[in-house]
Structure formats: structure tokens, C-alpha cells
């Protein structure tokens, strides 16, 4: 009996050691730290591009390229003049982003030059800590863009507004835009009724805009009051922020200096409908300081032949009763034109009607504004969805000092 117990103990110990060795080998096979160059697995799984590419916030030396995929993927952009001999691989805190929304900034471009580009995304099947499982790569067709350049003699652009999730409206307006070549398109806000999901942002705005702009015409976006509303409104900037991470910015193209303002909400923060979740008072106060600085101190405001301000609300939005000071600042800077939306019907507010020394153009929902600027004049035409002329006028260059 005694020897049987000893034999049983020895057998149990051997079994335990054997199982431990097997487990150790299994762990070693799972995480072979001694050979990090063992190839990762690649599966026959290719993502599809579901939106884009869309060119956003063009400048003279940079541009944002956005697209979306139907499955988690990485993203990169190849670009160049004549051949795709440069590549941008984005990083966030040292890691390549993985997801379905892809946003890459191409920097270091030359002003007024035309580039070709192509986006690519590789499927990430399983984002494991070691040897992530990868899939195959999808590439877009090759598109092109031309950077802004202050040395250009002329610039042409179109403006639309308040599309409010109406895909058919976007399709009709962008089709109308392309009847005459333009360098870029401005959307002055309220692309959605309120922001609730990524699919809504994609399906009701980004995808139809990207399709309509044909991967060649850049979009400049101005935030509207409806863009403040909904559970995803706080993430809306992930899709439409300018390059510096905000909604207020300036851009220059040819004889044109552009000032993009965020006119905020149309009611005070304390209005019950907001439940105390807005703080436009502080936000607009900071924006007011920025606006004064841009108009008074930014050299191009005085040097450019024409300065155009873009905003959603033609009365500057809710600014705690200080609408007059915004108009006065614009008057002092001798801006040439303010283009807005918000009212859903066309208005041409002429100088002097509301204390303004400049015309205010309020674009209707189903209209396209075409603007062409040269060193001496700025011509404006407004057409409806049928292409019928609604209004037309010309502004002559005026002294800025």
C-alpha cells in the first residue's frame, strides 16, 4: 500500500510537470517573444470604401482627405505631381488609427499646384496585442486637386447651404455647380437636422457631397445652428473640423481672403430647450476676440483685393445682444461681402439696410451662388435648382485703408 501511494505521487508530479511544459510551449507559440518577425496572418477580407474620398479645408500648402470604409481598417494617402511618389501615413500618439472613418492631412504642398492622389485602406480583422490579424487592401481611383494660391489672378467658387439631410437636394445642387468649373465649394451649415449617428452623417451629407464633388473639388464647411444639436453633435468636428481642430478659420485663394465664422446657436444658453448644456457665451466671446484680431491685424484682410466673410446666421447668431459690434468690426475692416444661410429663402441685404457697409447675401435652400473674383471686381450670380437666374451683381475693388 505504501509503495502504491509513492508511485501515485510520482505519477501525479510527472503529469503536472508535463502539463506545465505543454502550457508553456503553448504560451510561447502564442507570443513568441524571442522572434517578433514571425509573419502576422493575412485573411481574404477586403474592406469597401463607402464614402469618399472627400477633399476638405484646402489651403495653399495642405488639405484634408477623408473617406470611410465598411469595416475597421487603417488608412494612407499616396500623392504627387504626375506620379504618386509620396505617401502620408497618419498617426495618433504614435499609432496608426484603425477604424471606419479615415482623415488624413497632406502637408508641405506648394501653392497653386495640381496634385494627383489615391487613398488606400487595409482591413484589420482582429486588433490583437501581438500579430494583429490583417486583411487585404482597397484603393480608390486616382483623383486630383489644386492647392490654393494667393498669386492666382482669379478664383471661382460656389456656395450652398441648409441642405438638412436632403440627399436629392445635394445631388441636384452639386450637379448644377459642375455646369461651370469652380475651384472650391462652401457649405454654410445645417447639413443635418440634428446629429445622431455616424451613419446619418455619412449617408445624409458626407457621401452625397463626396460623390457630387467627384474627388476633385474641395469643400469648405461652416457650422450651422442645427449642427449643435443631437447626441453626436459633440463629435461632429471629427468629420468637419478645419485643420486646426476648430470651426473658425481663414483661407486665401487668388484675390480672395475668406473669413469663416461660427455663428453658434440662435437662442441664449439659458433657453430650456438646451437644458443648460450649451456654453456659447464663453465660446462666442473667444471667437469675438479672434474675429477682431483677424479683421484688424491679419495682413491679408487689408492686402487682398476682396475679403468675404462666411457664416450661417446673417445676424451673427446669438451673441448676447452684441450683433451691432460684429457688424461694426466688419465695417471698420471694409469687408466686401457676407454670405450666409439659415433663413431658407433668398435675401440680398444691401449696404445701409441693417447698419452694414457691405452687402449681405442670404442663400436659399435650393440655390447656388457663383462667385468669381479678380484683382478688380467680384461678380456674384445666384441661380435656383432649375438654373434660373435669381440675382446678379458686381462689386468693385475698394480701398482698405
Model regions and ranges:
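Acidic, histidine-bearing metal-coordination/catalytic regions of metal-dependent phosphoesterases
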Residues: 2, 8, 18-159, 178-179, ...
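Extended active-site neighborhood of metal-dependent phosphoesterases/phosphodiesterases
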Residues: 54, 116-146, 199-301, 325-337, ...
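Short, well-ordered beta-to-alpha junction loops that form the rim of enzyme active sites
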Residues: 120-121, 263, 310-314, 342
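Conserved, compact domain cores that house catalytic/ligand-binding motifs in diverse enzymes
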Residues: 153-231
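Active-site neighborhood of phospho(di)ester-bond hydrolases with catalytic His/Asp-centered motifs
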Residues: 158-161, 184-190, 217-225, 308-312, ...
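Soluble non-cytosolic domains of exported or imported proteins
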Residues: 164-168, 278-285, 320-321
Amino acid at each position: 500500500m505504501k509503495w502504491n501511494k509513492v508511485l501515485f505521487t510520482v505519477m501525479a508530479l510527472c503529469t503536472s510537470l508535463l502539463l506545465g511544459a505543454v502550457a508553456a510551449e503553448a504560451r510561447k507559440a502564442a507570443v513568441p517573444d524571442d522572434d517578433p518577425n514571425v509573419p502576422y496572418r493575412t485573411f481574404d477580407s477586403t474592406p469597401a470604401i463607402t464614402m469618399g474620398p472627400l477633399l476638405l479645408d484646402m489651403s495653399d500648402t495642405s488639405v484634408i482627405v477623408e473617406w470611410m470604409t465598411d469595416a475597421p481598417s487603417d488608412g494612407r494617402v499616396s500623392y504627387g505631381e504626375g506620379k504618386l511618389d509620396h505617401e502620408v501615413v497618419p498617426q495618433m500618439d504614435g499609432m496608426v488609427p484603425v477604424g471606419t472613418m479615415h482623415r488624413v492631412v497632406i502637408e508641405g504642398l506648394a501653392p497653386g499646384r495640381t496634385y494627383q492622389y489615391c487613398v488606400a485602406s487595409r482591413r484589420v480583422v482582429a486588433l490583437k496585442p501581438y500579430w494583429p490579424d490583417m486583411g487585404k487592401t482597397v484603393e480608390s481611383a486616382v483623383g486630383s486637386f489644386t492647392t490654393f494660391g494667393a498669386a492666382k489672378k482669379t478664383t471661382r467658387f460656389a456656395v450652398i447651404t441648409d441642405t438638412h439631410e436632403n440627399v436629392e437636394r445635394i445631388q441636384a445642387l452639386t450637379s448644377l455647380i459642375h455646369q461651370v468649373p469652380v475651384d472650391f465649394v462652401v457649405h454654410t451649415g445645417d447639413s443635418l437636422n440634428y446629429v445622431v449617428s455616424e451613419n446619418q452623417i455619412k449617408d445624409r451629407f458626407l457621401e452625397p457631397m463626396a460623390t457630387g464633388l467627384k474627388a476633385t473639388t474641395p469643400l469648405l464647411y461652416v457650422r450651422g445652428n442645427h449642427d449643435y444639436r443631437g447626441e453626436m453633435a459633440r463629435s461632429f468636428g471629427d468629420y468637419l473640423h478645419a485643420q486646426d481642430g476648430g470651426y473658425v478659420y481663414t483661407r486665401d485663394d487668388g484675390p480672395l481672403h475668406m473669413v469663416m465664422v461660427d455663428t453658434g446657436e440662435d437662442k441664449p444658453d439659458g433657453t430650456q430647450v438646451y437644458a443648460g448644456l450649451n456654453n456659447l457665451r464663453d465660446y462666442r466671446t473667444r471667437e469675438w476676440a479672434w474675429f477682431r484680431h483677424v479683421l484688424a491685424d491679419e495682413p491679408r484682410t487689408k492686402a487682398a483685393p476682396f475679403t468675404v466673410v462666411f457664416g450661417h446666421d446673417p445676424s451673427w447668431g446669438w451673441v448676447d445682444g452684441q450683433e451691432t459690434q460684429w457688424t461694426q468690426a466688419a465695417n471698420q475692416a471694409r469687408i466686401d461681402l457676407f454670405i450666409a444661410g439659415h433663413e431658407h429663402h433668398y435675401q440680398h441685404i444691401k449696404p445701409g439696410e441693417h447698419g452694414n457697409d457691405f452687402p449681405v447675401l442670404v442663400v436659399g435652400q435650393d440655390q447656388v451662388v457663383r462667385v468669381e473674383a479678380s484683382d478688380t471686381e467680384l461678380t456674384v450670380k445666384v441661380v435656383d435648382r432649375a438654373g434660373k437666374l435669381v440675382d446678379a451683381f458686381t462689386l468693385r475693388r475698394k480701398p482698405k485703408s
